[in-house]
Amino acid sequence: MIGAGAIALEFASMWNAAGSKVTLLIRKDRVLSAWDRRAGTTLTRELKRHGVNIITRASVTHVDTGANLGATVHYTREGQDGEQSVWGEIALVAIGRDPITDPAWGVTIDDHGHVATDAYGRTDKPGVWAVGDVTAGHALAHRAFEQGIVIAETIAGLNPKPVDEATVPQIVFSFPEAASVGLTVEQAQAREDLIEIKETNYPMLANARMLMRGTA
């Protein structure tokens, strides 16, 4: 499996729980590298503890597929010479999604293929608005709902606040699960408008659900 985001981790957890031998090839030193470091490091450790083989700092060079099911994934690793490979009955590539957009729509498309909008979802074509996966940012349904509300209120002549991207919650339904909302410590430290930054850790050993399930 190639990737270290939500889709890769959810499939890795599901197949691993079903008894399959799963190998995860990731480019960084931990999964969910865009999240808080502690969250990514902890989930990496727990996935390994549950039997998922995680190969870090790996760059896939090519994939060989046969006539039948099965694929050999070739990769190199940072700090190591030569190319290595791993074989599997199924190779899943989960390295992100691209929006399906077209310049023929008459709106500006950015370098990553997203429809360019202002903070209220307005494109540069009068009367045309954009929400959801075609816009830059988290490709999450609840974010799109909030964008839709902002657009509707703007059209109605109200004065809504733009969607605060930092408060959009994210969750990965892996085993164990991971959730995130707000700024990471690193992101907060990079902002000049924040004077004081505090971090609080809540141990899962104090969570009743985790204790009952034996996943604390």
Task: Label every PLM stretch briefly.
Residues 65-66, 83-85, 122-123, 127, ...:
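Solvent-exposed alpha-helices and their adjacent loops that cap or buttress functional pockets
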